[in-house]
Each structure stands twice: as structure tokens, then as C-alpha cells.
């Protein structure tokens, strides 16, 4: 029997559609940027996207060709938003450079990607000059300076839809892993549009962003497409609030209050700082418009989720993903029975990585076997879907990150409960293998973080002659607080088997972090495997 074909149009999924849609239907929706001097710049989607078309024309007039990489070295602001659309909608590839990386890494990344041009914030010019000579960059346009001159060379009405193939590259981002060279992930127009639809779907697993919302991406635009929020908000006509370089807690809280932010997204370290300020001055900021704060990048301590809700009436929604998954692949939402459950039960679920978004498929593997969904058995999380990378850019030596049947090996060790909620246990390189058993550093960290005296806690494996590895905790005390190692061990003891408890607890001034706010555990391992124990 012959199959019957559908009779629907073959309509390309490209970012040009989002641009035209926002200009046509949501032109008056606002885009607000906090400037370096703490003042505000206000514009709207219509004007910003007009300038994006102007940028697309100007890049072509400057001699750039289809597929050329245009880098940005910028904070979150409206000009960066213009590049998010003007570059890919002109047929070029947006390459966001992580301004927190070392110049040597930036030189490698810009060279490996083949960047021909860069748009850079004036304040970041000294950083650019440290590595530009080692790259193929030909053009430099400075925000608020030569960037504006570039735009004057073009008329936005000269822009013509380049009739892009939806599978053409739209953007690039390099991983910020703590081992090996950064690796390039190339997002297509299709994957970017589908990711925006998946993250923003008005269903229990999506964020449900609409025209009446105000979205604030605290997560940087220089990494993983700012979790897709610039595209999602533009697609839905939502107001956008960009914090610029002003990431101190007071500035962010002022932004949220003044602009009536309904959705905000950032890494746990950002929200820890905000929680501390809310605790110090409860009631100072009116955050009644806030629907939820999306947290990702590393596991969220259950204690933080409880503190925001109990003390301030604010909801934390955890998400999980990676640069390779565009980046959001799962989010937490509570089915009706769990939404009506007691607080402890709800917080247990909210502390998971949630359920996969539509079109993202997951499995948990130990060796060549699937791990049962019992909430106990652990294995490596593997994913596939339309916004999951199929390979790295020009890095054939990393092909082993994909299975023979096409799944991406995330490197995250997880368990799955019977309903499919993902519990991140550890990174495969960070799990502690003690006496043939696994200890989850993340679970011990989150338990320690519930202690009122601690601001941060990171747990690592250190070599042990008898057990192979044993856990060591590096902890940071809150200002004015005190605690002893024995007190901290006693605090978490009811939650774990005795052999899970850290043999050493080290008090440190700060925990080193990666460019995207994750703990740099490799630095801690180097420090504490070279030093004798100070506390035990």
C-alpha cells in the first residue's frame, strides 16, 4: 500500500520570520537596557529590529559574505539584541565570545571559528586587544562608536530576505568546559526557532511567555544564546529587560521592581546574591509581578528553593541543559497532584531537573544497559532532539561524545524517578568513587548549603589509599557567621550514610568559578591534593 503525503506547505523555520513577526505585530513592545552608568535606555521591538535590518545590510556592504562569522564581545543590551537578529538574518553567523574567558582561550576560539569581524563594547576593547592579533578578525566595530557609524552606511529598506535554508548556521557558541580546548556548537535557524517554541510553549513544561510579560535574561547573551530568551521574547512580543554589565543584586532587584519583570533567568550564584539581599532588607523591593525565576547552569540547592518561597513568596523553576542542547532541554513544573502536595514534597520535585521539553528525548545508560526509573539507580544521561548538537564544529576527535545510534552523551550522572523527573547527581568527572561505590558531590553540596552559616559549598574527590577517593568539602561562610567542621558534618549526617560524609571540610574565602558561574572543581582538586589537611 502506498503512503499518503500531507498537503502542508514546506515553510522554512528561520529567524527572519521572528523578526518580521515582531515588527508587524509587537512593534511597540519595549526593550529596556541598564547602561553602565546605571541609567536606562528605552526602545521597542520595531526600532531595534529596524536597526537589525540596517546591520544586516551594513555587514554586506562592508564586504562580508554569506556564512561569514561575526563575533560579539558584549554584555546584555539592545545593541547585542540587534546583532542577535541582524547577523543571522543577513545570512551571516553570530558568534558570541565569552568575555570571562582568558585571552588565550578567546584567541583560540576566534581563530578556530574563523571570525572575520567583531562587535565589541567600548569597555571590553582592552580585552580584545590582548588577543586580536592572533585571530583572523578584519573588522572591529565598537558599540556607541564605530558601530553606529557602520549602521549609517546602510538603509534598512535595502534589506532583502536572503531566503535562508532553515538548516543554515545562525549562531555559534563554544563550550566552557574545565578540561581540554573549548569546542564549537553551531546552532541552525531551525534549531533556534524550535528551541524558542519548546522553551516558550504554553504548557506545564514551558515558560508560557506572552505579550503581557516582561522577560529579564540575567544569563549572559555571550553564552548559549542567553538560553534562547531574546528569540522567545521577540517571537511572543514580550517586553525585554537587559541588565547590561550591572549584575550586582541591588541593580537587578531595582530592574525587576521598576520594569515589573515576570520571568527572569540566571545561574544559582546570581540568585544566591539576590536571596541574601532580600533577607537583609525584606519588603524593600516589590516583586509581586514575578511569576518565576528560571535557574540553570548547575544544580539548585533545595534550601534555596524553600527560602525564596517561604520567606519571599517567590517561585524557583529549575531548568537543565548544556551548550550542546541550545541550551534548555528540561524544566520543572508540578502536575496538579504535586502542586497541591505539602511544601516538602513540592520542594523535593522542584530541586530536580524536571522533565524533558517537547521533542527532546532522554535515556539513562550504565554501560550498554538502560537504567531503571526507580529514583535510585544512576547512569549517564543521553539526549537527542531537534536542538541537540549532532557534532562539534571542526573537531573530529570529539566524535566519541555521540553514541553509534546518534544520542549525545552529556557527561551528567543522573537518576530518574518513575514519573520521569531527572535528578542530577553529578558530572561524570566529579562523581566520587569511594570503595567501589558512588557518592554524589551535588547532593552533599546541597545539603551543606542548607546550613544557615554557609554561603557556598563545593565537594570534590581527593585520593585515598584505602578507599580510592574520599569527599572533601570546601565551604564559604556568610559574613559574620561561624561554624566548625564537626558542626557541619553533624548537620548533614541524618541525610546520608556515614561513608558519604566529607572526611575533610576546608573553610575558604571563595570558591573558584568558571566563566559561566559554575564551580571550577579542577582548581579545587589541584589545590587540595597538593596541600595537607587543615581541618578534619
Predicted features and spans:
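Gly/Ser/Thr-rich phosphate-binding loop
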Residues: 235, 258-266, 276-348, 361, ...
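Conserved ANL (AMP-binding/adenylate-forming) active-site segment centered on the GW(Y/F)…HTG consensus within
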Residues: 345-350, 371, 386-411, 428-429, ...
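Conserved AMP-binding/adenylate-forming core of the ANL superfamily
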Residues: 31-77, 81-85, 102-107
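AMP-binding/adenylate-forming catalytic core of the ANL superfamily
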Residues: 101, 118-120, 264, 385, ...
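Conserved beta-loop-beta connector loops within the AMP-binding
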Residues: 355, 359-382, 418-419, 481-485, ...
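Conserved pre-ATP/AMP-binding loop-to-beta segment of ANL
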Residues: 27-29, 155-174, 181, 206-214
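Conserved AMP-binding/adenylation subdomain of ANL enzymes
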Residues: 193-214, 222-262, 277-281
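Conserved AMP-binding A3 loop
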Residues: 41-46, 170-197
Amino acid at each position: 500500500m502506498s503512503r499518503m503525503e500531507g498537503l502542508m506547505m514546506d515553510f522554512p523555520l528561520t529567524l527572519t520570520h521572528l523578526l518580521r513577526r515582531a515588527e508587524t505585530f509587537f512593534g511597540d513592545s519595549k526593550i529596556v537596557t541598564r547602561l553602565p552608568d546605571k541609567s536606562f535606555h528605552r526602545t521597542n521591538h520595531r526600532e531595534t529590529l529596524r536597526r537589525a535590518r540596517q546591520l544586516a545590510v551594513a555587514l554586506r556592504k562592508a564586504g562580508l559574505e554569506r556564512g561569514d562569522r561575526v563575533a560579539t564581545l558584549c554584555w546584555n543590551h539592545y545593541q547585542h539584541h540587534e546583532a542577535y537578529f541582524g547577523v543571522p538574518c543577513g545570512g551571516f553567523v553570530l558568534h558570541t565570545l565569552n568575555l570571562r574567558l582568558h585571552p588565550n582561550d578567546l584567541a583560540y576560539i576566534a581563530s578556530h571559528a574563523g571570525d572575520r569581524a567583531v562587535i565589541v563594547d567600548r569597555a571590553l576593547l582592552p580585552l580584545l586587544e590582548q588577543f586580536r592579533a592572533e585571530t583572523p578578525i578584519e573588522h572591529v566595530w565598537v558599540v556607541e562608536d564605530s558601530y553606529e557609524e557602520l549602521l549609517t552606511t546602510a538603509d534598512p529598506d535595502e534589506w532583502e530576505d536572503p531566503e535562508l535554508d532553515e538548516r543554515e548556521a545562525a549562531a555559534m557558541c563554544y563550550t566552557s568546559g574545565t578540561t581540554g580546548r573549548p569546542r564549537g556548537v553551531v546552532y541552525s535557524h531551525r534549531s533556534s526557532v524550535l528551541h524558542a517554541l519548546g522553551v516558550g510553549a504554553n504548557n506545564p513544561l514551558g515558560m508560557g511567555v506572552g505579550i503581557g510579560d516582561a522577560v529579564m535574561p540575567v544569563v549572559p547573551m555571550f553564552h548559549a544564546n542567553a538560553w534562547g530568551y531574546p528569540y522567545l521574547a521577540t517571537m511572543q512580543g514580550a517586553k525585554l529587560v537587559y541588565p547590561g554589565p550591572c549584575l550586582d543584586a541591588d541593580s537587578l532587584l531595582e530592574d525587576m521592581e521598576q520594569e515589573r519583570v515576570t520571568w527572569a533567568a540566571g545561574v544559582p550564584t546570581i540568585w544566591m546574591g539576590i536571596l541574601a539581599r532580600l533577607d537583609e532588607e525584606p519588603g524593600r523591593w516589590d516583586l509581586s509581578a514575578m511569576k518565576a525565576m528560571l535557574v540553570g547552569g548547575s544544580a539548585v540547592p533545595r534550601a534555596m528553593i524553600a527560602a525564596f518561597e517561604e520567606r519571599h513568596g517567590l517561585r524557583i523553576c529549575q531548568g537543565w541543559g548544556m551548550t550542546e542542547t541550545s541550551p534548555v532541554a528540561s524544566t520543572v513544573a508540578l502536575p496538579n497532584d504535586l502542586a497541591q502536595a505539602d511544601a516538602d514534597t513540592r520542594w523535593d520535585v522542584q530541586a530536580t531537573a524536571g522533565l524533558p521539553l517537547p521533542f527532546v528525548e532522554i535515556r539513562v545508560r550504565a554501560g550498554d544497559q538502560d537504567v531503571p526509573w526507580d529514583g535510585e539507580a544512576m547512569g549517564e544521561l543521553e539526549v537527542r532532539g531537534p536542538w541537540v548538537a549532532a557534532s562539534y564544529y571542526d573537531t573530529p576527535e570529539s566524535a566519541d561524545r555521540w553514541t553509534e545510534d546518534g544520542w549525545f552523551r552529556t557527561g551528567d550522572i543522573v537518576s530518574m524517578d518513575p514519573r520521569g523527573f531527572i535528578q542530577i547527581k553529578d558530572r561524570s568527572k566529579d562523581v566520587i568513587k569511594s570503595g567501589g561505590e558512588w557518592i554524589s558531590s551535588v547532593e552533599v553540596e546541597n545539603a551543606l548549603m542548607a546550613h544557615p552559616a554557609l554561603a557556598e559549598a563545593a565537594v570534590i574527590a581527593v585520593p585515598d589509599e584505602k578507599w580510592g577517593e574520599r569527599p572533601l568539602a570546601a565551604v564559604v561562610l556568610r559574613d559574620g557567621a561561624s561554624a566548625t567542621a564537626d558542626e557541619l558534618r553533624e548537620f548533614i549526617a541524618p541525610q546520608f550514610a556515614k561513608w558519604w560524609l566529607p572526611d575533610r571540610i576546608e573553610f575558604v574565602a571563595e570558591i573558584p568559578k568558571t566563566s559561566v558561574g559554575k564551580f571550577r572543581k579542577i582548581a579545587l582538586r589541584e589545590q587540595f591534593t597538593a596541600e595537607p589537611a587543615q581541618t578534619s
